[in-house]
Swiss-Prot record:
Topology class, membrane: Single-pass type I membrane protein
Record keywords, A-Z: Glycoprotein, Membrane, Signal, Transmembrane, Transmembrane helix
Organism whose genome encodes this protein: Saccharomyces cerevisiae (strain ATCC 204508 / S288c) (Baker's yeast)
Positions of glycan attachment: N32, N60, N80, N89, N156, N171, N175, N202, N240, N259, N311, N362, N433
Localization: Membrane
Signal peptide bounds: 1-20
Protein name: Maintenance of telomere capping protein 6
InterPro entries (UniProt xref): Telomere_Capping_Maintenance
Entry keyword annotation includes Transmembrane: yes
One Gene Ontology term from the biological process aspect of the record: cellular response to hydrostatic pressure
A Pfam family the protein falls into: TIM-barrel_MTC6
Amino acid sequence: MWILIYLFIIWSSLRTWVTAVDSTTTVGDDLNETVSASVWPTMSPQMTVAFRSQRDVMGNLTIDQLPYVGLNLRRVLLNNETSMVNEGNNTRLLTLFKSMLSSEANAFVLDLEQYNNDLRVVDTTLLFSDVLTALQSFIFSTQNNLYANIIVLLLNISAPELDSTEYRHQNQTLNTTYILDKNLGNSFIYKPTDLQSDRAKNNTWNIYGKSSIDGWPTLGSVLYEQKKRLVIGELTDFFNETTAPYIFPHDVFHYEQGNSTLDCPSTVEGLTDLSSIHWRFLDSLFNSVDIKEYISCGLSPIISNSAYVNNVTQLADIIHEGSVWSWDSDQPSVTQSTSKSGSSSGTLEAYNCVLLYYFANNETVTWRVGNCYNSNIGLCRYENMAFRWLVRSNKATYFDFDSYQGSKCPDQYSFNIPRSPLEQRSFIAYMRNSSFSDTQIWIDLNSISVSNCWVSGGPYASCPYEKVISRRNFVTMMVPASVCSFALLCIVVYLSVLRVPIYDNRKNWRRVINKISKSELEGVPS
């Protein structure tokens, strides 16, 4: 019995310790996880952290202003020049498509044609339902705060060669709602009715602020509150609101092919005017150099490089260059710790804060991890104005620049960060007009609470993915359990070693009992 109690005490102590250790696990532990298929090059742990941190920084941007990097599937994969298509290997095509979804690409142009009251991918034997099933599988596997992101699916519909009466009849009998419901599920789709509802609730914004007329919801609202993952739009004029209520019409999107008619803005006024245009896509040929320039000009590139048609994985480098518009090539490091350490000179080090490096000679910027205890100037933004910046000349550590005691930013300004390529472009314009030389500037991004979890909101912002227990809280939690376990263990040892007096004098006690028994009368009293 005592052995069982002792084992229970040990088990309870170990369980408490394991629970505490598990709760201190950082986001870095999931860096080796992947939802990618083996066909497409998987993102490295560093790339995963960089891409996720960008997504989180853009959480308060509206979904129509996000920088998307996309693929024209007919040009790069689903066409009759591709060996897999010629072989009729639909399984490999779908596997490759799913692995593309796991890459940094988050917009896709898909060419469809009507086929026996159904939709089929042009130049293949794939049905639209097959693509939707693969898309559903990917969404299910990434439906969490770590991996979730918005996907844009743009449809080019080829009309059948029929007269107007037959065309109108087939268009009306094609039930796209049924196809989407059966193979994908409408709960993941952000629909036109959802946009109407958000605008009615005043939950939409444009560049000037809240707008119930032409505003769109933020990325954070769509992903985390509404749990939506997919926006479907049509680039042709095949459907209408009645035949395809889940699909946004073509006039919602600014979609161009070849060369862009939009100028690359260099002033605040030009940036504001460009931001008033929703969903800016450019379908063209790109390389790893010019795609970054198009991204910085506020366009979302759709890659149509047919030269890679038989080795589509070569596009991974181009997609990578377009997707990461913020961090430097070797950043952020995923091996740093949030603990304070002292260097040989006796100074504190904590490489968990982000510096924006501005290079005046070529007017470029990049983000790098820096020591939070170093003194640098910081970046401030004016209220909710997306393109109005101020760099403070007084230097401070990251902890002192924006602390509980107050911010180094002046009134009506707040410690901030460029949240998009356009905002970063406006910052470059500010630095150029202010004649700054090469400069390192604190921005509102750090991983102080949890390693590899980069968050905004000052030095005391918490990681949304992980509950953090500090060493002090860990000791506070463990001490009572340890003391109680030790006390119970002492009692068990004491009772197992020492005998109670009645047990030690058992023979004497039996002699006394026998003597008393002899003096008792036997029989029944008369």
